[in-house]
Structures are given as structure tokens and as C-alpha cells.
UniProtKB/Swiss-Prot annotation:
Organism: Agrobacterium fabrum (strain C58 / ATCC 33970) (Agrobacterium tumefaciens (strain C58))
Top-tier EC class: transferase
Stored SMART domains: KH, S1
Family as reported in the entry's similarity comment: Belongs to the polyribonucleotide nucleotidyltransferase family.
PROSITE patterns: KH_TYPE_1, S1
Lineage, top ranks: Bacteria, Pseudomonadati, Pseudomonadota, Alphaproteobacteria, Hyphomicrobiales
Record's protein name: Polyribonucleotide nucleotidyltransferase
Amino acid sequence: MFNKHSVEIEWAGRPLKLETGKVARQADGAVIATYGETMVLATVVSAKSPKPGQDFFPLTVNYQEKTYAAGKIPGGYFKREGRPSEKETLVSRLIDRPIRPLFPEGYKNDTQVVVTVIQHDLENDPDVLSMVAASAALTLSGIPFMGPVGGARVGYINGEYVLNPHLDEMDESVLDLVVAGTQDAVLMVESEAKELNEEIMLGAVMFGHKGFQPVIDAIIKLAEVAAKEPREFEPEDFSALENEMLGLAETELRTAYKITEKAARYAAVDAVKTKVKAHFLPEEGEAKYSPEEIGAVFKHLQAKIVRWNVLDTKSRIDGRDLSTVRPIVSEVGILPRTHGSALFTRGETQAIVVATLGTGEDEQYVDSLTGMYKERFLLHYNFPPYSVGETGRMGSPGRREIGHGKLAWRAIRPMLPTAEQFPYTLRVVSEITESNGSSSMATVCGTSLALMDAGVPLAKPVAGIAMGLILEGERFAVLSDILGDEDHLGDMDFKVAGTADGITSLQMDIKIAGITEEIMKIALEQAQGGRKHILGEMANAITESRGQLGEFAPRIEVMNIPVDKIREVIGSGGKVIREIVEKTGAKINIEDDGTVKIASASGKEIEAARKWIHSIVAEPEVGQIYEGTVVKTADFGAFVNFFGARDGLVHISQLASERVAKTSDVVKEGDKVWVKLMGFDERGKVRLSMKVVDQATGKEVAADKKDGEAAAE
């Protein structure tokens, strides 16, 4: 019934198994990949023909984590997996980025890759395994695909590279880098690092590339016995059309691409495009080519013109040389009632970035397959359509916004203070108000400025820069601070963020094969110079974090209480803590380890709450004198509240030095009295005395007498 095939290798100390032919047999390609005991199912289906009028390649990648994979049931009311989580979105992009460039130009059939995590051993992250499984499924499917692709994670622990570290090892690593590529070239890099230099980062990329070669060999071995017959696909030859169009439009296109201002340049290019369409798509008579074909060839021609200009003249669209960064203006404190704010403008790319400080209640709970955890640093990136002068959908963030926000988050996080140093939840929102390339790196710069404006003690300022590449045969040019057009028409998008001393985040997407180690080295070195230049420009606005928080930011005081006292502070059903919050006005957050965070904009409210909690958890000392309040009287004595919520009995014999007939002869409810803690009885009940304390002065009577006797002698 089943025509099963599998291949198994030892990879970084664990078995990797790729199996096909048993599950999802109606898909064009399906592979179950197992690494350790983590398992994913990858499937791929591609339509047999493109939709009429399709002018782009409709590739969709869906990565999904099933909670049953970790033996869990989804939380929430419906108990069913819902919309994709942030991680699912990010891993979908991670799979998409290295495989997209390997489909042949002109292939426009609807293609969908679905990767499902069906088992998680809580040791091996399924993201890299999902890349491998998707690559294998595509290679077996017969769909036109110039793979296979391999992928690996690289850590850096105690000065050594580690291939595919376990999840628990990542806490020790100063690097989390995922790299993907073919046998000959690197196609994609995604990383977070703790201020590592360019040499270490480049070494990690090459280490990972070498490390996943056995995986590519395994996929090829499986394909030799299990791959379907390749589909016939022959891209159409439009060279004649391109040559004719070049003769018609080259001069005007070259002139248009010398216009430095984006809107004017786009208008000039559109005018040339209109002329070209009018020539090849006459109103009368039958057109030789379709509008989609004319548009695709014109776009190809645009790329050629821009690339030729750069390689021939070393001058770019806006007149800059290869390494010059656009003019930068940095401002902080632009929204004085917010906790921290910045406006970062670089050329025609601009971001308003706002930082907000919150308490432990504001932390985001994340329910992942590996367990529930809390995130205290949030960064949200918004890209409204007006930022590029267009209309469009407004609503929940798309994949691109989530991905760009996470890239900036990775860049900033290594420089944040620890929760012990700065016990605030941090939320940063980046509103992209203008965009002409590198808005994610503008977000990095703006976030650094806004956090410093808010008084968050960043270890060092962070800046980011986007690099580009144009490669034609042996000739190449590395571009600093690329424009949107240079991104679309170039061969590489290489984003580098970090401090003056090292890299904190690196993301690379390469659209062609053949990027060498030498080119990557040049790009990293050029990016370092650009990054330091940007940091210098940012320093014109602010050089280090402000010494104090803004006027409208909450203040937080941290105290620690014994774990066995947490119940007393919270009270039955939360009664005690609710009363403290209501009467003092402060916000209180209690961790399981006894850490208490008290937050308020008022120092008086914080102090009142702190004293209240201290009175609950502290223990009264035997022999000490306390001021208290009579809360109840009885025939045998009076109950006095003398220490926080703690009451104790003053026996009738301890009310006064003379004999007392009735308790009410000496005290009544509500009286303020001085008491001495004499000790505890065998049941732990408090024993208090009033008669040994002078009720007028609060001093011990016995001590006064001794002092008088000593003076008389």
C-alpha cells in the first residue's frame, strides 16, 4: 500500500531522518523529518498552470505548531489552535526566504508549502528542521526548484562555534544564528548576538554553511530513489522584446533614474512606462505581447539600467557614492507627555518611535510548545500605506510588519538592562511615517533614541544599516544604506545592527547564487563604517540614557519577601492585596520567588504600600516596644493591634501596675497604647504588657526605675 523511502544520518550528535511515501501522498511532495524526537510534516502543492494574467510568483509558506506535539491542550475558550502566533509567522518567513529565489524566473503557478510540527521533544527547536523538511518536499515534488536547500543553527559558547545547540544550551550562547543555503552558496542568515565582531559573525555563517552540507547530501540521496518526474517548464524568451524596448526607452530611463527625489523619479519612470505600453499595446490592431509580459520585461529593463549605472559610474540613483549614508536628523522628546520618544529621519525614510514603561502586570504571557513564559520587552512596528504615498489596508499587522519588528527587537535586546537592574516592562512602538528603504533599521535607531530618552539604562546606543549588492559576472558593488529601488533591483538585502563595539543583529537575504565569503566580508566591513557614522549622528540628539525617568513614567520599587509569606500578603481570595492597592493607590505585582514590585507615579503611594507589606511579612521582636490600637476588650484583658495586621492579648494583669477590676476601667476600643512584646505562649499566641511601659512616653518603666536607682547611688 505504501511506497516508503527514507534516509537517516547523524547530524551534530543526533539522528536526522527524512521519510516519504507514507503520509500525505496526494500532495506533490511530502516529507516527515525527525531530529532527535522532534518531528515535522512538510508538504508542497503547486498548481498545474498559472492563473490567467498572473504577473508574480504566488508562493505561500505556512508553518504551524500543534499543541498536541508537546502533549498540551490549547488555552482559551475554544480549545483549538487559532490565528498564527508570532513564532509561527516568523518561522514561515524563515522557510520562505531561502527557497523563494530558487524557483525559476517566470514560474507563476500557485504554490503552497505547509509545515506542521507534530511532535516536540523540548530539546530540538523545530524551525531549522522545518526548513530542511520543506526543502526535501520541494526537491521530491517535481516542481521546478533549483535546490535542495540546507539550514542550520549556530551558537557561540565559550569561544567556540556549536552546531545546532540544544534549547537549554542557548542560554549560555552569545549567538543565535540561523543560516540556509545551497551546496555552493549562502542564501539567508538570521541572527541575534551579544556584541560580536564581524570576523566571528562571518565565521559563524561559514561554519553553518559547512555544517548543513550532510543534510543536502541526504536530501539528494532521498531524491535519487523517491523524486517524481520533473514538470516541464521552459521560461519564455523575451530577449527580442527586451532589445526592442531597450532601444525605445533606455535614454529616458537613464535620465529618470538620475532624479534624486523619489516621487519625481517615480513619476518620470511611470511616464516612460506609459510610452512603452502605448508602443507595444496599440489601441488599434492586435498586440504581439500581453500587458503582463510588457510589465515584466519593463521591470527587468529597469533593473538593468540601475545596475549598469552603479557598476559603470560607481554613482547611485540619488547621486551618492557606494558607501555614503543619506543625511540623518535625530530628535528626542518630541512627545513630552509620553515616557520616551524620538523622531529618526534618514533621507526619505522616517520613523516616530515611542517608548512606554509599565509594570509586571503589563508583561506579555507567551504560551509556546516549550511552556509558558513572560516577555518584558515588546517592540511593535507599523507600516501604514501613507508612508509610501499609497492607499491600502489598515488592520492587524502582516507578516512583514511582524518580521521587521522582530529584527529590531533582536538588535536592541542584548543592550537592555536586566529585570533586577530595571524592573520595568518596556513597550516600544515604531510608526513608519515615510519609507524609501531600510525602515527596519530606522526603527532600530529610533528605538535606541526613545529608550534613552525614557531613562532606560541601555548599555550602549544601537544603530542599524541596510546594505545592498549588485553582482554582474566578476564585477560587483556593495551599497551602504540602500534605497527601496536598490533593494528591489539589487541582489542582496543585508541588514546589520549593533553598537560601536560589535554586532547585535544580522539579517541577510540573497536573491542569487554565488555570493562569496569575500563579498560578505566587504559588506560587513562597509556596514561597520556606516553603523559608526549613524551612531555619531544619533549622538547629536542624545549620547546616553537620561539619569531619571520622565515626569509621567511610573516609579517601581522592588522588595523581597519570604515565599511562605506570599499567601499572607495576598490574603484569602486576594482580599489583603486588594485592600492595599485600593487604599494606597499603588500597583503591586508579586512573583512566585517572593519578588514584589510596587509601582506608582507617586513616591508617597509606593512608600505606603511598602510599609504595609513590610508590616505583614516582618516578624515582631521580643522585648521591643510598639505603639498599638485597642481593637477589642474582654473580661480577661484587651486585644491590641500592634504590628501591621498582627494582634496580641494584654492580659488584665498586665494592663497596669495596680490591680485592675475591669478591663474597661483602663482602656476602651480605639485607644492608642504602648505595649511591650513579652513573648509567645506554647500555641504561638502573642503576650503583650502595658504596665511595663510608661504610657505617656513610650519608654520602659523598669528601665526608668533602674536609671533612677543608678543615679541615686
